[in-house]
Structure formats: C-alpha cells, structure tokens
Amino acid sequence: MSGSMIVFRDEIEAFIYPELMEVAVRGERAPVQTVLDAVKQAYPQDRLISVRMPRTPQQTYLLKMNDDHGLFVYADPYSGELLGAHYQENTLIGWIALLHTELLIGEGGKNILGVSALLLICMCATGFVMWWPPNGIKNISRGFKIRWAAPWKKLIFDMHRVGGIYAMFFLVIIAFTGVSLVFNKTVARLTNFVTASPSRPATPLSDTSGAGRAIPSLDEFLNQADRISPAPTTWINLPQSPQASLVVRKKMPEEFHPNGRSFIYFDQYTSEVLLIENASEAPSGTRIFNTFYPLHTGIIGGLPTRILQVVVGISPLVLFTTGFIMWRNRRKVNR
C-alpha cells in the first residue's frame, strides 16, 4: 500500500508544495555555487550532502542536508534564493516514503523489508502451486474465471484465486526488485555472476595532498562534466570526508532510471577526473541491475506502468482480505 502511495510522489508534492517545487521561468540560472553558499550561510550547523538539479525549467533545486532523509532545502534556480525547507519525516508523503523504505527505523527496517520481500516471493510460489488445477492444464481456464453468480463464499474464493494469479507475476517483480534495493551488493554480485560480468570499479579517492589549495567552484566541476558528457546532470554528491571524491551523476537518453546511472568522479581539490562510468557502456550485469529500480517504481514504461504499479501495490491488501475471509469460513466449518 505504501508503495502505491508514492508512485506519484513528485506530482503529489508539486501539488501540495507548489511554492517549494516550481518557480516561474525567467532569464539565466544563477551559478550553482551561489545556491550552495546561501544554504551554508542559512544552515551553518547542517552538512550539505547532495544537490538535485532541476529536470525542467520550472523545477527548483533540492539540497539534502545531513543524510538522504534529513533536512530538505529548496532553492530558486534563477535567483539563488532559498524558498523553504522541511524534514522529510514531517511531510505526509515523506513519512509514507520512509515507512515504505525503512519502516521508520533506519537500516534495521530496510533489512526487515528485504526479508519480507523474499517471503512474498515464497508466498507467490506456494499460491501458484495451490492455484494449479488438480486435473492439469486441460482445466487451466477455470483458474482465470470468476463465477459472479455463485454463492458469496465461492465468489470470495474465485476473487482470491483469480486476483492472485493475475497479480502474481507483477508481485514477484516488485518483490525481487525490492530485494535488490535492500541487499544491493549481494544482488549485484549475483547478477554479475550469472551474466559473467565484471564488477563496477571501486570508488576512487581524492588526493589529500591538494588540501589547502583554492578549491574550484561547483560550476567548474559541472562545466567540466558537461564537456565530458552533454547528458543532463541529475544529482551532485558532495564529498563527506577528506578522501572522498565529488560525483556528478548524469542520465543518458536511453536510460530507464529516472536519475541515470552514469557517474563522473572528480578529485575534490583539483577537479581532476578520476573515473567515468557511462551506463551505456557498462557490462551486461550492471545494465541489468540498473533496470531494477525503474522496474520497482513502475517508471520503466511511463504512465501506464506507473498506474499498473499502483493497482498491483493494492493487490496484497485485497488478497489478504479475501484470504482472511476464506480462513475464517473454514474455521467456522471445522468447529
């Protein structure tokens, strides 16, 4: 249910908080460094970790502070003015997103959800075995029919059986891709093993001997990244340690992932390019793994698959309800 509620998160937040999410288009954009300086001045006790670049001329900057789910600050891309801020957990859709991704309890919640997704796959498998007609494939068509004129108990049974078989395929995809997001390193290794693909290169580090020099502005990093690849920049990950690199994330035209999976790593002190990861040229294992997130969110097929994702996300509640009614009826009969 929570997953269905955040499929259209961006659209919902733009409707609820229009003053934070969109601005009128006017002139040239202000330098990104201007926005960063304004944020650091306004929030001196907080740590800026990443910047979401505007995807449309109207969209604002989103600056994440302290961690991925901490303080969200929004800025006008044309004036550099800060428009407002909130903690993700203090907004309804943000709270639902945290419930969906970590049960509101952090890393432990993620692991619980990952195991639950594995159990859902097992339930789908056992459900398929129970759905399979006892007389074999000759009577398989009965498993796809609902007898609407039947007594209500048989109607509930048919709704559970037919709804389950139609939802099963999509639920397995959602569950498996959910597992890949929680246990990403394990699933990535498995994908690489199955496809005989090499692993992604290790994250490069900055040379700390450059500390103390005049650090290039963020706009210089972005201009250099654009010279390397003209694809749109989606996120900038700022270094959180003296050794960390500054990462510019880009989305290639052929990518399904909404944020892209192409990365350019820079030395944070010198702007030297340390590594370029082009999603279009990645090994097959990495390319397959990169489809799991857009499959999980339904974005891979545009609006139709996003709507389908909402419907499929509601199906476990329907199956649980009909299954509970069937269990209760059997219990009454056995008394």
Stretches with model-predicted labels:
Residues 1-335:
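Conserved histidines in hydrophobic membrane contexts and catalytic metal-binding motifs
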